[in-house]
């Protein structure tokens, strides 16, 4: 038995030693260049191949290198909650507003005008062709239709214009002058009578209207967005992506988006870059808003024309204020647009795509899905298809077109529509603001490819039937959610923390030799799907590539800002380029400042002396990515950062003290008075300490000598001078001693003055203690006497409260006992009743049998 116990003891001892030696403490290690990121909202900048247009004069030159690298990660994407799409909407609006350049206030034109509703230029009725006499073939145009060239297709009339006269002070403020102006009928509000009509410019009472003072017109621009240095763009490359996907597994990374074109229109999107040989849609995750990309196979196009030979002249009203007017000799014909392509099949495919969408809950019958326009009470930009053609705003009535694509019997079906032109329009980005555009001279024509459809999917119940309306929408911003909704802007966070067993200033660990990896700037995130262990071995090459890419992009931005410094005020891109430059510099300096504050400047792998704060949280170097690890330790970042800064401060303090000691190696420092003062002060402290030590030793020696003699403790001071010393018995001295000799050294010698001084100290200390005791006792007595009246009600209240609590406890206990007894009695009674009922039910067959037996007997 003892032998077994010894074996167990030895085994436990070995296990303890092995555990002590095998357990190694982990320390915080800083890694620079890891493939990790977080969502960002910094400004993007533009790149374009066309540097001739005014809107892109400040964009970076696009070299056509649109590189995308696949990343083995899973990321969430949302086209509506997306900083890329929001920036696109804001920037395009800024370009749109800059192109108009509103600067001349037209508030002085809010005067009463006398307008004609008679005459050759205003009374001509629109040229229309009755539906009954129009052949069906004439309602559908093609490239060979003769009416296209002359703008005489059935249903296209003359534009409703009005000549108005008004009086206003001109260059001479004391004299009024009569002016003549021609207006579109839709831009006036009139009250007519038999003789004349009094009209006002529309929206005079709601807004300050401004007219363009520069001849810029809104032309489409092609450009792409690029991320600032230190940032990247992730894109969901999944064909099933429909505007919202919390886990997209097919992700690519790039530094720029695809090329896109500025679009400002309702109902349809024109000249988009997302068209494919399929129809797909983006659906809002919490709403019925959608944007549908049309199949390019059907070759859908729209051709718009504004006939006429207009001239534009400035009218000087008041001093230095010019207003662009449009005198007309004859009424112009209406603007109109016609649609080419297989629209009927395209809309049928749109309906089938809606049915297949997982969020759709309506009918599966395409005959019950209709393409409709918005309600009649909406704004003109919503009720009509609103677009811009060479500076003129077209408001097109789409009833004929909807009747055609839906094949509505009994209605007018045409593949072209008539459009009205308005110069006072509602803005599409800021509610309630109006702008005024001067018309462009001559005949205008615009040709566009129709690439998308903006709509709301409305499911409703008509009796027992479920129907669906594809209601056309005026959300211009949806066009850019289709163009850029699959992108996501992220900030690369190259600094990461992980626990390792290596402490700072330890010997260098052996590293595996690997081939040099040539990575571009995007190659940093290409390693995002790799394990942490494999990624950490290539941090040197990655960090060098990262820094090189940041420096290169910064240099490009700096060059373009320097070259076009005088044009920064023209467009939004000048400001965004400067913001991007500042953002890049701030990010780089911030990372380097953090590394420097931890003592890890210009290091890819930096070991520290800070212990890892959570020993239970360690990474799986072979199976875990850096992005996954960063999400797990995100809550430790603040704590680790503070610990690293404290450790670095302590190290710098130690280095400072060491350098102060090393400074004595220089001969000249010996003559520095400030250095000597510290040592002089230290010497004074040493002398004072020696004096105090000497006093303590003296007191201890005096007390030791007092213990050798006898004296009554409470005797009076003179008594110890009369004390009879007790001598030790000793024999006759060997030699005769004279009076001058000191006698035997072992004889007792009394020191009366030391004893008297000690007695005096004891008496004073005793008096001091008695005084302190009496003072404290008196203070406590007075305090208790003062607090007694105030504490008495409190004590009484506490007694009442204690009594109430005890009574409440007893009441609860009594109620509990009563409830328990009641429940027990009720349960027993219920159980007896149930048992009797069950016995009665069980006895029924026996009673029946007994009854039958009695009946048979």
Swiss-Prot record:
Q: Which residues are glycosylated?
A: 39, 72, 81, 116, 121, 142, 150, 167, 193, 205, 237, 240, 271, 277, 288, 299, 309, 364, 397, 407, 447, 464, 469, 614, 623, 639
Name the residue ranges of motif: Di-leucine internalization motif. 856-857
Question: Where, by residue number, does the polypeptide cross the bilayer?
Answer: 683-703
Q: Positions of the region V5?
A: 464-472
Q: Which GO terms describe its cellular component?
A: host cell endosome membrane; host cell plasma membrane; membrane; viral envelope; virion membrane
Q: Where is this region: MPER?
A: 660-681
- Record's miscellaneous remark: Some HIV-2 isolates have been described that can infect cells independently of CD4, using CXCR4 as primary receptor. These isolates may have an exposed coreceptor binding site.
State the name under which the record lists this protein: Envelope glycoprotein gp160
Q: Which organism is it from?
A: Human immunodeficiency virus type 2 subtype B (isolate UC1)
The organism's lineage?
Viruses, Riboviria, Pararnavirae, Artverviricota, Revtraviricetes
């Amino acid at each position: 038995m003892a032998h077994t116990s010894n074996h167990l003891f030895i085994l436990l001892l070995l296990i303890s030693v092995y555990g002590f030696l095998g357990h190694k403490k982990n320390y915080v290690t800083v890694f620079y260049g890891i493939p990790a990121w977080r969502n960002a909202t910094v400004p993007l900048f533009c790149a374009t191949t066309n540097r001739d247009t005014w809107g892109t004069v400040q964009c970076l030159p696009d070299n056509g290198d649109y590189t995308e690298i696949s990343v083995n990660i899973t990321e969430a994407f949302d086209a509506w909650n997306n900083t890329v799409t929001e920036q696109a909407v804001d920037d395009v609006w800024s370009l749109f507003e800059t192109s108009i350049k509103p600067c001349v206030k037209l508030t002085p034109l809010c005067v009463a005008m006398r307008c004609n509703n008679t005459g050759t230029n205003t009374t001509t009725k629109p040229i229309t062709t009755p539906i009954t006499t129009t052949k069906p073939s004439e309602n559908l145009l093609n490239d060979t239709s003769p009416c296209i060239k002359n703008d005489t297709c059935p249903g296209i009339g003359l534009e409703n214009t009005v000549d108005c006269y008004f009086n206003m002070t001109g260059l001479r403020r004391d004299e009024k002058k009569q002016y003549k102006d021609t207006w579109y009928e839709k831009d006036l509000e009139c009250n007519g009578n038999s003789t004349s009509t009094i009209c006002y410019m529309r929206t005079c009472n709601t807004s300050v209207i401004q007219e363009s003072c520069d001849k810029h017109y809104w032309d489409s621009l092609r450009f792409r967005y690029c991320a600032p240095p230190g940032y990247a763009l992730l894109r969901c490359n999944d064909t099933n992506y429909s505007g919202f996907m919390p886990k997209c597994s097919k992700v690519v990374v790039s530094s720029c988006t695809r090329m896109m074109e500025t679009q400002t229109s309702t109902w349809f999107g024109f000249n988009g870059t997302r068209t494919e040989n399929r129809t797909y849609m983006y659906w809002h995750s919490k709403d019925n808003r959608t944007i549908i990309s049309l199949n390019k196979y059907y070759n859908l196009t729209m051709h718009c024309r504004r006939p006429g030979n207009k001239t534009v002249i400035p009218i000087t009203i008041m001093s230095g204020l010019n207003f662009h007017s449009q005198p007309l000799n004859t009424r112009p014909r209406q603007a109109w647009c016609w649609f080419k392509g297989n629209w009927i099949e395209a809309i049928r495919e749109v309906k089938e795509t809606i049915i297949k969408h997982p969020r759709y809950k309506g009918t599966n019958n395409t005959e019950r899905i209709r393409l409709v326009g918005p309600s009649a009470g909406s704004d003109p930009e919503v009720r009509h298809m609103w677009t811009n053609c060479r500076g003129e705003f077209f408001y097109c009535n789409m009833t004929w077109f909807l009747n055609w694509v839906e094949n509505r019997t009994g209605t007018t079906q045409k593949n072209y529509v008539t459009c009205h032109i308005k110069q006072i329009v509602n803005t599409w980005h800021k509610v309630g603001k109006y702008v005024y555009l001067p018309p462009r001279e001559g005949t205008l024509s615009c040709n566009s490819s129709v690439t998308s459809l903006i709509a709301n999917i409305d499911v409703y119940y008509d009796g027992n039937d479920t129907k669906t309306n594809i209601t056309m929408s005026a959300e211009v911003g949806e066009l850019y959610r289709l163009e850029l909704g699959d992108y996501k802007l992220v900030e690369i966070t190259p600094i990461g923390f992980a626990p390792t067993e290596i402490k700072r200033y330890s010997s260098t660990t052996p590293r595996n030799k690997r081939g040099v990896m040539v990575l571009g700037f995007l190659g940093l995130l290409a390693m995002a799907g790799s394990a942490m262990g494999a990624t950490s071995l290539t941090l040197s090459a990655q960090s060098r590539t990262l820094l090189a890419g940041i420096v290169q992009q910064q240099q490009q931005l700096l060059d373009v800002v320097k070259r076009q410094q005088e044009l920064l005020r023209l467009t939004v891109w000048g400001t965004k380029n400067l913001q991007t430059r500042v953002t890049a510099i701030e990010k780089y300096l911030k990372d380097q400042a953090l590394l420097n504050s931890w003592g890890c400047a210009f290091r890819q792998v930096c070991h520290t002396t800070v212990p890892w704060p959570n020993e239970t949280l360690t990474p799986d170097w072979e199976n875990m990515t850096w992005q996954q690890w960063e999400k797990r330790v995100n809550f430790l970042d603040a704590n680790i950062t503070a610990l690293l800064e404290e450790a670095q401060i302590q190290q710098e303090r130690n280095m400072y003290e060491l350098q102060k000691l090393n400074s004595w190696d220089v001969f000249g420092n010996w003559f520095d008075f400030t250095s000597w003062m510290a040592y002089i002060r230290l010497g004074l402290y040493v002398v004072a300490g020696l004096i105090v030590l000497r006093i303590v030793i003296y007191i201890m020696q005096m007390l030791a000598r007092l213990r050798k003699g006898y004296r009554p403790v409470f005797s009076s001071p003179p008594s110890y001078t009369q004390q009879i010393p007790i001598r030790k018995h000793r024999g006759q001295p060997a030699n005769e001693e004279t009076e001058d000799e000191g006698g035997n050294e072992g004889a007792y010698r009394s020191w009366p003055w030391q004893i008297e001084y000690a007695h005096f100290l004891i008496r004073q200390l005793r008096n001091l203690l008695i005084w302190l005791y009496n003072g404290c006792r008196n203070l406590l007595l007075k305090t208790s006497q003062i607090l007694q009246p105030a504490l008495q009600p409190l004590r009484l209240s506490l007694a009442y409260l204690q009594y109430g609590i005890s009574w409440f406890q007893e009441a609860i206990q009594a109620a509990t006992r009563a409830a328990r007894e009641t429940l027990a009695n009720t349960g027993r009674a219920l159980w007896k009743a149930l048992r009797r009922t069950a016995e009665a039910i069980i006895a029924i067959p026996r009673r029946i049998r007994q009854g039958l037996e009695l009946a048979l007997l």
